[in-house]
């Protein structure tokens, strides 16, 4: 019996080995071959007997028996009859699960078009027949005729005729032509299409046609027709003659109590199809009138449409409860569809979930598991052990013992759980550290205990979070859990390579308190023999924790032979630091402990420990730090009282000063000296500055206290104020929060992001009055609303990123490329935001680095292909090297995947990355995980306005030389430079010509220093008005107004008090309709009123004035070069939000073209201007060598940065604006676009203080660049203008080069991540991402093969993924397949030879062959 059962198990679990999956159209014969019988009746089951009706939708004869091994009438029961077909009811005796696999079919009485190929845009049927979709629909739904056979008449084939036209044609031509309606007609047309001829004909037209749109359309048709030819699909299969019926267990009918049934919507839809089909058959048999038959055919078409994709055409068919029925298409698409609900994510058994609490006494690799949970989760193991050890004779007995919870069960549980890791997961799992393995420790209670140090990785807290426990069952799973997922193996974060197991909050506070020093503490000045003595004195109460002492410290380090060498010194320290030294492992220097330890310092200590002493020491140290921190935090007794919030005495004065300044501005506004916008900006600036000053005063007050030392002198020491200690140590709170408690709350924002100009001057200690409280409620609500939106958006960004990068895996060691990208430090203003060492750490050099000695021959300092670790980065620093070329994922030459040299160090492990590492997914997680921390929108001054006064000058911080880049300037009346270019940079360079500072200088700034002039730190080198944007005169002369008509394009504002008039230009939206076309312009003319030209060109000097600009000149007044002609108040640009935060990151990765993007020069050459049209000017670039002149029409309101006669390089900015990544790629190349995207994304994250390694962003950029467009196809069979995978072009080019043929020339494309995911080679991956219907339609027509290269496809088909531990499994399969193919060919070779030679010769040859192929 057992053997029999085993036989059945084996029988069904055998799966075919497969390497690829193909999708294609099903031919009617194929559908019939799948089917086990035709479904003829719409009935489902008999309502009395509950047995399925014969030939109905649940028929047992077609689909199989309802009960295992039992026919429907009950004549044959049990296993012995298996395989018998009952002669009475016709049911085969077998397992009932065949009802999940066996399909049926419906023979349709009239052909029916498949709605996917008809309505899924672009319509495949329409494209193939070259008919508009509207015409095809009219034919299909029996409104018009289509000519299928034109004969000798004047009618065209595929011409659409209305009823009247058809009758006229019949009268005229009789039966010389044939026209039909319905799907029949379409099917005939499709069947009659000769694909090969059509294709050749189209290729001929393609070569002759010159219109772009026509070419595009023809190319589309060629691609579709070729797809049909190659895939051996027949076009007529897009029209169905046979409809397959889904197995009944996949569309179940479930009896509810009370005699009602719950049914899948598909049954309803099938029933409608069968009913209409049967009625149509009957009508055709009766030869009913044409009009009735036609109506029935149309209804059948609609029923089939609804079954396949309800709601795609017309109104969706609804069920009894008014909701649309779920069709086959709805079953697979969307979050609840087959792909995302059941294939990519499944519910898991052997799992449990519970609330988490703190386990402060656990070791890092442990978690506390409640006994009840453990007993339930490990049941099968316990049963097995009980039986094995003879406590229970059968499993049933064991079960009873476990249910009674006998004492022996608990002992066994202890035994089972030992060294059996479990996995803990906290939703949302944003990165791979959201699931880690721990060894369980049994505990009482019902909550899971979690080690406090892993909370940062899980982003968990103990306010009611829940976590899930999963048990790895097989030995391999346990091994992986222990070796790869154990929390002790995940010390470094994969996003940036820094420790993620870092103490926070209490622990930090405890260590900080312990390592602080206090003047005049008990025991100061003692000299001690070592840490043990220090602890002894502290425990006995003879010395204070903070007492300054001298102590003998022994430090160890490795010498050259790898032995420990020790050195002992007498060091100035404190009692607390000496006690802490006892837990620090051998090999770390005392200096790490001998300082006030804040969060950063502790992180550095752990990082150093990991790099110097490895993982084990680090884990032990982390645990010890945690225990110590908790203990001393408890001893410190730090707590917060209201008196800790000390309000500075200067606060009142500062606020009074600010208020008087605001009054002054108000008066200036009333006298008309400043506009409303300027007044608003200035008021906000005054309050922002006042807030800063109050905060500064408060921090000075809090941070230090004056005490008397033991010599009787007063000295300042860091304060022991509790709030200050918490903020200073980095345990909790920040200066901004303390500012609200003890300074002033400051400016608040309205919901639309504009700032309310009256600030809240009170703080929380003083308390807010009603008005102040009301103002501050805005911000609080907005915060909550934003958070909800943010989480959803961030999750969606992560999903798109994972989808685009999921198939990127490290597949080889070295691709031997010499290309790479150049790295230099990130400098913004006077600060180095990211030094070079942080950017290149863990990367591989692309070329040798030479020593930068000018006098000697430069010798190689670091050779190419070196992995830059901490040591080499120190070398770079010593030799003050400024730029380094490193290998990058973007430039890697591996065809499928990336090589480990181009990727560099695996950040989470600290050594070069292994083959099989899924770097794509890691990159996506690293970028997506901090997404929730990014703001949704950055206002120009965030929530509680957090910004000091606007910058209005450049004051430098280092001594050095001024270097001005991209500058165009004029000299004003005072002899100073005025900048008139828009992307000027001012850099300060030191004597080694390294950039120390770099600033953007705005248009209109006055620069006080010349280029290459020496400056010393603290000097102001440039200044400008931050509130307005000026228009600067570039020549001297007289002003002339054009189109400045009072009341139409401008309004004059006269000031009552001063009598000054200023002219304000109206925005086009504010003007009357007749004045919409006026272009208010200022022109500079000479004394006779003739045009003055820009020097060296024949362009007259004129300035178009944008709306809202203010002119304070009179027509005809004299002006001097460098004067301000008009001002544009900044408020207009201020209210436009800078897209920041998450939306900005999404825009960059989606490669969206910004509105009004910068215009770049398409070629290098000289600028000239051609004939203008009404609203645009014609810009021409003439290349210096021979070549065509490039022309472009640019709207007149765009401000140009170039003048006539100026030379520009390809990719130079002609008109300002945000740059479009597509333009950068086209004009400046892959490196530039990589640099642009990486820097822009990093700017957003850096603003939030999130560290992400550049290579993660580069990985995504590589995936965005994976397509290329063919420009010239060379000797290949690609079409011109076709978009192809870059790797396929590379492979094809290599092949062509070897054969000495013409190579393909191409340009790289930049696709947004959504587009790139949908454009992947794998249709399974694309379909499970978005637009499922479109992807599947397209792939099936093309008969695509999915090679199952990526991770997602393999998860969906249920195999190991080709990454991580599954990588070697896949490599082996490939190898095995290759080997067996080789054997096959050898076999065939041998059989061919043996027909001509003797047996002896054959055996000799065979041994020779085998010896040659056997591995040496």
UniProtKB/Swiss-Prot annotation:
Keywords assigned by UniProt, alphabetized: DNA-directed RNA polymerase, Magnesium, Metal-binding, Nucleotidyltransferase, Transcription, Transferase, Zinc
EC number: 2.7.7.6
Pfam family, one: RNA_pol_Rpb1_5
GO molecular function, one term: magnesium ion binding
Gene3D superfamilies hit by this protein: 1.10.132.30, 1.10.150.390, 1.10.1790.20, 1.10.40.90, 2.40.40.20, 2.40.50.100, RNA polymerase II, clamp domain, RNA polymerase Rpb1, domain 3
Binding site residues for Zn(2+) 2: 815, 892, 899, 902
Needed cofactors: Mg(2+); Zn(2+)
Gene Ontology annotations for the cellular component aspect, listed alphabetically: DNA-directed RNA polymerase complex
Free-text cofactor note: Binds 1 Mg(2+) ion per subunit.
Residues that coordinate or bind Zn(2+) 1: 71, 73, 86, 89
Enzyme class: transferase
Signal peptide residue numbers: none
Catalytic activity, as annotated: RNA(n) + a ribonucleoside 5'-triphosphate = RNA(n+1) + diphosphate
GO biological process terms held by the UniProt record: DNA-templated transcription
Binding residues for Mg(2+): 461, 463, 465
Family as reported in the entry's similarity comment: Belongs to the RNA polymerase beta' chain family.
Function of the protein: DNA-dependent RNA polymerase catalyzes the transcription of DNA into RNA using the four ribonucleoside triphosphates as substrates.
Database matches in PANTHER family: DNA-DIRECTED RNA POLYMERASE, DNA-DIRECTED RNA POLYMERASE SUBUNIT BETA
NCBIfam families linked: rpoC_TIGR
Binding partners and assembly: The RNAP catalytic core consists of 2 alpha, 1 beta, 1 beta' and 1 omega subunit. When a sigma factor is associated with the core the holoenzyme is formed, which can initiate transcription.
The protein, known as: DNA-directed RNA polymerase subunit beta'
Organism in which the protein naturally occurs: Blochmanniella pennsylvanica (strain BPEN)
Gene: rpoC
């Amino acid at each position: 019996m057992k053997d029999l059962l085993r036989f059945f198990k084996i029988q069904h679990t055998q799966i075919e080995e497969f390497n690829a999956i193909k999708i294609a159209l099903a031919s009617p014969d194929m559908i019939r071959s799948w089917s086990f019988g035709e479904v003829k009746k719409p009935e489902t089951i008999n309502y009395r007997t509950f047995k399925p009706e014969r030939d109905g939708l649940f028929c047992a004869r077609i689909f199989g028996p309802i009960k295992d091994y039992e026919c429907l009438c009950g004549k044959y029961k049990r296993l012995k009859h298996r395989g018998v077909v009952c002669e009475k009811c016709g049911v085969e005796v077998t397992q009932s699960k065949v009802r999940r696999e066996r399909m049926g079919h419906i023979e349709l009485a009239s052909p029916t078009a498949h709605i996917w190929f008809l309505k899924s845009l672009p319509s495949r049927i329409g494209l193939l027949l070259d008919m508009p979709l509207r015409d095809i629909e009219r034919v299909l739904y029996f409104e018009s005729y289509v000519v299928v056979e034109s004969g000798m008449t004047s009618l065209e084939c595929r011409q659409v005729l209305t009823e009247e036209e058809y009758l006229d044609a019949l009268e005229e031509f009789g039966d010389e032509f044939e026209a039909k309606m319905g799907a029949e007609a379409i099917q005939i047309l499709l069947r009659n299409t000769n694909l090969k001829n059509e294709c050749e004909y189209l290729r001929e037209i393609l070569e002759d046609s010159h219109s772009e749109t026509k070419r595009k359309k023809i190319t589309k048709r060629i691609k579709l027709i070729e797809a049909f030819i190659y895939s051996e699909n027949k076009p007529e299969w897009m029209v169905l003659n046979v409809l397959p019926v889904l197995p009944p267990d996949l569309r179940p009918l479930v009896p509810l109590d009370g005699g009602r049934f719950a049914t899948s919507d598909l049954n309803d839809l099938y029933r409608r199809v069968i009913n209409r089909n049967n009625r149509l058959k009957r009508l055709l048999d009766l030869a009913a009138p044409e009009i009735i038959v036609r109506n029935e055919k149309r209804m059948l078409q609609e029923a089939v449409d609804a079954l396949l994709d309800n709601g795609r055409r017309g109104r969706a068919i609804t069920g009894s409860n008014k909701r649309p029925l779920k069709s086959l298409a709805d079953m697979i698409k969307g979050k609840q569809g087959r792909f995302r609900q059941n294939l990519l994510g499944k519910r898991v058994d052997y799992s449990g979930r519970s609330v988490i609490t703190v386990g402060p006494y656990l070791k890092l690799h442990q978690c506390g598991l409640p006994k009840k949970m453990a007993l339930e989760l490990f049941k099968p193991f316990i049963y097995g052990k009980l039986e094995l050890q003879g406590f229970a004779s059968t499993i049933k007995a064991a079960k009873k013992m476990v249910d009674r919870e006998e004492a022996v069960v608990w002992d066994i549980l202890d035994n089972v759980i030992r060294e059996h890791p479990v996995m803990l997961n906290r939703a949302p799992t944003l990165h791979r550290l959201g699931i880690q393995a721990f060894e369980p420790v049994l505990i009482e209670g019902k909550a899971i205990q979690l080690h406090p140090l892993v909370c940062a990785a899980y982003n968990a807290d103990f306010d009611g979070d829940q976590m899930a426990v999963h048990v790895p069952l097989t030995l391999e799973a346990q091994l992986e859990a222990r070796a790869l997922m154990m929390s002790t193996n995940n010390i470094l974060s994969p996003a940036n390579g820094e420790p993620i197991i870092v103490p926070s909050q209490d622990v930090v506070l405890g260590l900080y308190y312990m390592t602080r020093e206090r003047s005049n503490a008990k025991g100061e000045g003692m000299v001690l023999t070592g840490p043990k003595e220090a602890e002894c004195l502290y425990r006995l109460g003879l010395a204070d924790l903070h007492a300054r002492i001298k102590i003998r410290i022994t430090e160890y380090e490795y010498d050259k032979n790898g032995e420990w060498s020790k050195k002992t010194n007498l060091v100035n320290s404190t009692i607390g630091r000496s006690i802490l030294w006892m837990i620090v492992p051998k090999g770390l220097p005392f200096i790490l402990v001998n300082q006030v330890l804040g969060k950063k310092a502790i992180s550095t200590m752990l990082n150093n420990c990991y790099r110097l002493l490895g993982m084990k020491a680090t884990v032990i140290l982390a645990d010890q730090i945690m225990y110590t921190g908790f203990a001393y935090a408890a001893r410190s007794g730090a707590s917060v009282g209201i008196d800790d919030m000390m309000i500075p005495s200067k606060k009142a004065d500062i606020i009074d000063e600010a208020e008087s300044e605001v009054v002054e501005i108000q008066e200036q506004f009333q006298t008309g000296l400043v506009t409303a916008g300027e007044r608003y900006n200035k008021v906000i600036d005054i309050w922002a500055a006042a807030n800063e000053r109050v905060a500064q005063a408060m921090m000075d007050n809090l941070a230090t206290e004056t005490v008397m030392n033991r010599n009787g002198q007063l000295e300042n020491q860091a304060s022991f104020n509790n709030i200050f200690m918490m903020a200073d140590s980095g345990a909790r709170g920040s200066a901004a929060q303390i500012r609200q408690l003890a300074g002033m709350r400051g400016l608040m924002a309205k919901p639309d992001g504009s700032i309310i100009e009256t600030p809240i001057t009170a703080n929380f200690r003083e308390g807010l009055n009603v008005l102040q409280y009301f103002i501050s409620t805005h911000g609080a609500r907005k915060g909550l609303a934003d958070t909800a939106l943010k989480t959803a958006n961030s999750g969606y960004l992560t999903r798109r990123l994972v989808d685009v990068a999921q198939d990127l895996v490290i597949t080889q060691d070295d691709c031997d490329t010499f290309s790479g990208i150049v790295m230099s430090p990130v400098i913004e203003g006077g600060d180095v935001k990211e030094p070079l060492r942080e950017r290149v750490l863990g990367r591989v050099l692309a070329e040798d680095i030479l020593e930068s000695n000018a006098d000697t021959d430069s010798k190689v300092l670091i050779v190419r292909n070196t992995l830059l670790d901490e040591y080499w980065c120190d070398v770079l620093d010593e030799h003050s090297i400024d730029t380094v070329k490193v290998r990058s994922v973007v430039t890697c030459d591996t065809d499928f995947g990336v090589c480990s040299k181009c990727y560099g160090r695996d950040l989470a492990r600290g050594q070069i990355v292994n083959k099989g590492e899924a770097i794509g997914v890691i990159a996506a997680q690293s970028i997506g995980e901090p997404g929730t921390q990014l703001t949704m929108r950055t206002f120009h001054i965030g929530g509680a306005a957090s910004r000091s006064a606007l910058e209005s000058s450049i004051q430098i911080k280092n001594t050095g030389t001024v270097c001005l880049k991209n500058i165009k300037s004029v000299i004003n009346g005072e002899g100073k430079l005025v900048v008139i270019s828009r992307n000027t940079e001012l850099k300060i360079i030191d004597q080694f010509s390294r950039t120390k500072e770099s600033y953007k200088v705005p248009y209109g700034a006055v620069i006080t220093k010349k280029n290459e002039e020496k400056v010393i730190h603290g000097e102001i080198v440039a200044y400008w008005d931050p509130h307005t944007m000026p228009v600067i005169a570039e020549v001297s002369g007289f002003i002339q107004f054009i189109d400045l008509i009072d009341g139409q394009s401008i309004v004059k504002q006269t000031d009552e008090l001063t009598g000054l008039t200023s002219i304000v230009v109206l925005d086009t939206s504010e003007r009357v309709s007749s004045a919409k076309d006026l272009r208010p312009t200022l022109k500079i003319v000479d004394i006779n009123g003739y045009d003055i030209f820009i020097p060296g060109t024949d362009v007259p000097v004129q300035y178009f004035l944008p709306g809202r600009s203010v002119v304070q000149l009179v027509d005809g007044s004299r002006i001097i070069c460098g004067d301000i002609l008009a001002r544009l108040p900044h408020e207009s640009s201020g209210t436009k939000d800078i897209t920041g935060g998450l939306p900005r990151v999404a825009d960059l990765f989606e490669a969206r073209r910004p509105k009004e993007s910068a215009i770049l020069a398409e070629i290098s050459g000289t600028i000239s201007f051609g004939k203008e049209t009404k609203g645009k000017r014609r810009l021409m670039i003439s290349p210096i060598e021979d070549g065509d002149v490039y022309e472009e029409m640019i709207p007149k309101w765009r401000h140009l940065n170039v003048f006539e006669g100026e030379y520009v390089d390809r990719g130079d900015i002609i008109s300002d604006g945000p740059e479009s990544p597509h333009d950068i790629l086209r004009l400046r190349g892959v490196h530039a676009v990589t640099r642009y995207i990486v820097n822009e994304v990093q700017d957003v994250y850096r603003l939030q203080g999130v560290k992400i390694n550049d290579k993660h962003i580069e990985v995504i950029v590589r995936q965005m660049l994976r397509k290329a467009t063919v420009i010239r196809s060379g000797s290949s069979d690609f079409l011109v203008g076709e978009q192809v995978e870059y790797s396929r072009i590379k492979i094809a080019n290599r092949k062509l080069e070897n054969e000495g043929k013409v190579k393909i020339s191409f340009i790289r494309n930049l696709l947004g991540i959504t587009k790139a995911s949908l454009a992947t080679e794998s249709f399974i991956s694309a379909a499970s991402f978005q637009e499922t219907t479109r992807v599947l339609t397209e792939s099936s027509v093309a008969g695509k093969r999915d090679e199952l290269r990526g991770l997602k496809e393999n998860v969906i088909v249920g195999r190991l993924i080709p990454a991580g531990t599954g990588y070697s499994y896949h490599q082996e399969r490939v190898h095995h397949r290759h080997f067996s193919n080789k054997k096959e060919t050898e076999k065939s070779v041998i059989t061919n030879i043996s027909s001509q030679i003797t047996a002896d010769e054959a055996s000799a040859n065979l041994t020779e062959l085998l010896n040659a192929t056997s591995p040496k």
